[in-house]
Amino acid sequence: MALNDFHVSEPYTLGIELEMQVINPPGYDLSQDSSTLIDAVKPQLTAGEIKHDITESMLEMATGVCRDIDQAAAQLSAMQHVILQAASEHHLGICGGGTHPFQKWQRQEVCDNERYQRTLENFGYLIQQATVFGQHVHVGCANGDDAIYLLHGLSHFVPHFIALSAASPYMQGADTRFACARLNIFSAFPDNGPMPWVSNWQEFTGLFRRLSYTTMIDSIKDLHWDIRPSPAFGTVEVRVMDTPLTLDHAINMAGLIQATAHWLLTERPFKPQEQDYLLYKFNRFQACRYGLESVLIDVYTGDRRRLADDTLRLLDNVTLSARKLGADSAIDALRLQVKKGGNEAQYMREFIADGGSLIGLVQKHCEIWAGQ
């Protein structure tokens, strides 16, 4: 299948997608009623989009094209209000978090959607297991070559994005010992992890053509890379974050990615090389396992750095870009998070250590999302 031409978009514009959990109180397991909720909400939207994701326990909120994080926050907040009102009327709950802590994948119903049914045919039970919840951030690019450079530049900071957003320590009723267990779900997919190496947009079109030979790839949406170009939107899409427990944290993560993109494309601090990726999966694994306490290994020198320290260095590097984009509040909030040494996975474990149950944890997450 031919690839769309890269749509020219205004650089550094934003789009945010949040995959939300639809919850069935009082047991607080995942519901299978997202279609009912989506049908109730759609007529009330004034901006953005609410749609299905893989299974009937998932709901995706997506902004339109936003110039800055304030506009994105306004759109998401309006959607949040409408969704919560409809959820209350249908006796459902809504929450964030990268995984539901005790749902059973065998119970998950794949949406009655041509694309998802085709994906179920291709991947079998792996699609039901992929009932996990992430945040995706799109950043606008002027052309395809800029998009490829930006993708490679952002790949340096995949561990940082994972650790800051980690919110999936529990799965199938057990503590996984990971800060972010969600990304492990995709390890069996043939396109998991980083995009295969290309150096420019022309090479990318050739890569996509070859991937389409598999008959499993009909569009860019069928590729599960950590970061991927989206030519129809004219963006680069970062896909490694867990869905946060709060809208504020989702906005902060989007602000960081927007500011990092601006810094990368204006300063060009890296000359991308295929060798950059030799330790990519090791560093990614470390971030998933240990969060901000993990250790990064420099592929060229062998130097070892605490991810928390390297994250503070990234925040310092992008501060000026954030100020120009109106995203400095996001950088300030994330800097404070790193200095306090925590993420939402750590909070979840503390809740359980203090005597809470997994059912109580999901109930608490619904209350947090509802602002209670």
Curated annotation (Swiss-Prot):
The keyword NAD belongs to this UniProt entry's keyword annotation: no
Keywords: ATP-binding, Ligase, Nucleotide-binding
Enzyme Commission code: 6.3.2.2
Catalytic activity annotation: L-cysteine + L-glutamate + ATP = gamma-L-glutamyl-L-cysteine + ADP + phosphate + H(+)
GO MF annotations, alphabetized: ATP binding; glutamate-cysteine ligase activity
GO biological process assignments: modified amino acid biosynthetic process
Keyword ATP-binding: yes
The protein's role, per its UniProt record: ATP-dependent carboxylate-amine ligase which exhibits weak glutamate--cysteine ligase activity.
Homology family: Belongs to the glutamate--cysteine ligase type 2 family. YbdK subfamily.
PANTHER family given in the database record: GLUTAMATE--CYSTEINE LIGASE 2-RELATED
Subunit structure: Homodimer.
Record protein name field: Putative glutamate--cysteine ligase 2
Organism: Salmonella paratyphi A (strain AKU_12601)
Taxonomy of the source species: Bacteria, Pseudomonadati, Pseudomonadota, Gammaproteobacteria, Enterobacterales
